[in-house]
């Protein structure tokens, strides 16, 4: 028996509600309603900069993952060498949050499955801790995939996504970037 390993084409990513002005599971720190901060590119960039990808790879995934800056790993057809993961930069993230009008942050729930991807719930918990460092009071709610995906895709009003900030995974069936 010969054992080998290598990167898969599965990428774990965060889906952020950028379209609804009033997004569920996002409030001011006091719990009052606010305009959806995820609509602001500076907030989304701040979130990306607050993620310590090296820590997720080494501690949560115990070295069996690689950082990704796009939806496929290096070496796959259609992957750009110019798209790198954002650095871990909490100081810059805090500045972007302030520039976007959220110097004190806001509250948000991270939703994800707890039985679909390797260490999915642990990744969500690690992300919450990282977001808390830049002023986003993030809580985590995970659930079995049979419940999660239905609610994530059409569990809200008018069959809209029920969640605002979701942990998801994606892999190209053909191993190239244009594959759905």
Please state what every model-predicted region is:
Residues 1-60, 66, 76-180:
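Extracytoplasmic/periplasmic ligand-capture domains
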């Amino acid at each position: 028996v010969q054992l080998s390993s290598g990167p898969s084409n599965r990428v774990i990513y965060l889906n952020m509600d950028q379209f609804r002005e009033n997004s569920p599971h996002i409030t001011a720190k006091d719990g009052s309603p606010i305009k959806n901060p995820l609509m602001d590119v500076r907030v989304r960039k701040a979130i990306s900069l607050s993620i310590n990808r090296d820590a997720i790879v080494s501690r949560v995934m115990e070295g069996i993952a690689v950082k990704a800056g796009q939806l496929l790993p290096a070496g796959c057809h259609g992957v750009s060498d110019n798209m790198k993961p954002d650095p871990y930069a909490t100081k810059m993230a805090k500045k972007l949050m302030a520039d976007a009008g959220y110097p004190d942050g806001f509250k948000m729930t991270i939703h994800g499955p707890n039985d679909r991807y390797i260490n999915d719930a642990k990744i969500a918990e690690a992300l919450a801790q990282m977001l808390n460092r830049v002023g986003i009071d993030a809580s985590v709610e995970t659930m079995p995939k049979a419940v999660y995906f239905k609610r994530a895709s059409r569990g809200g009003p008018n069959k809209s996504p029920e969640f605002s900030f979701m942990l998801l995974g994606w892999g190209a069936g053909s191993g190239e970037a244009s594959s759905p």
